């Protein structure tokens, strides 16, 4: 796509060549964008390399952009052949009617997937809680066995042979009160007549 300075210069050249005055050329250049007429099907000319006068007339940002990307504009035909448009033969794109029916099913599928993720996370949390409860109860049982020995020697011997006591750590809840309430309402929602058990 030509830069604004190049496009304006080309429009002024066309207007001056057709015999219009310089003041009328600037006005026609602004309105030419909205004018409907026959589109030119000529391939873009390799005149992207501006003359020194036109290059000096450009603003600094446009000049820098042109100097950086001018090579790519020369190869516009090659780029168009490398990356062809998907619908070259069709002037308009007809949407696929199958996407309309898929769009209707997407929210329920998304909700089911989201519910599945929530259920899986809650199941993992339950398993982790059960493991912690088991280790805590086992540690309590070991300490009770050691306390109930008749002598200190028997208690030390039993303590040496039993596995070490694990201090249970309390896992903080990653959800705050508002998020936990939201998760519980989602899990208790009625979807298709079924209430998801917690």
Curated annotation (Swiss-Prot):
InterPro entries assigned to the protein according to its UniProt record, in alphabetical order: LKAAEAR1
Top-rank taxon, per record: Eukaryota
Pfam families named in the record: LKAAEAR
Region: Disordered, residue numbers: 1-47
Biased composition range(s): Gly residues: 20-30
PANTHER family linked: PROTEIN LKAAEAR1
Protein name: Protein LKAAEAR1
Gene that encodes the chain: Lkaaear1
